[in-house]
């Protein structure tokens, strides 16, 4: 067993990407309305993302990367892992 595999975090639960999105914008001092403005997405869409009613698409992930500085791959992986966990 390698040190990496010994200490790798593998939770048995999934956190909705919207929770992480809200935590991220909170930490940056950005409101949902400001995020909507900066991404060019309707506020309704941002609210749906945060509330887990809408999925983070590849396009949305790129917009979040541009505005928040968090790589699109992070958002894409978070969304994929969450959806996979919900189906298990």
Describe each region flagged by the PLM.
Residues 66-88:
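Short amphipathic recognition helices of helix-turn-helix/homeodomain-type DNA-binding modules
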């Amino acid at each position: 067993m390698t040190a990496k595999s010994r200490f790798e975090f593998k939770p048995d639960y999934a956190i909705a990407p919207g929770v992480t999105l809200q935590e991220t914008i909170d930490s940056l001092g950005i409101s949902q309305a400001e995020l909507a403005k900066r991404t060019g997405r309707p506020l309704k869409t941002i609210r749906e993302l945060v509330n887990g009613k809408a999925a983070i698409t590849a396009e949305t992930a790129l917009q979040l990367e541009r505005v928040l500085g968090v790589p699109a791959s992070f958002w894409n992986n978070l969304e994929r892992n969450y959806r996979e966990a919900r189906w298990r």
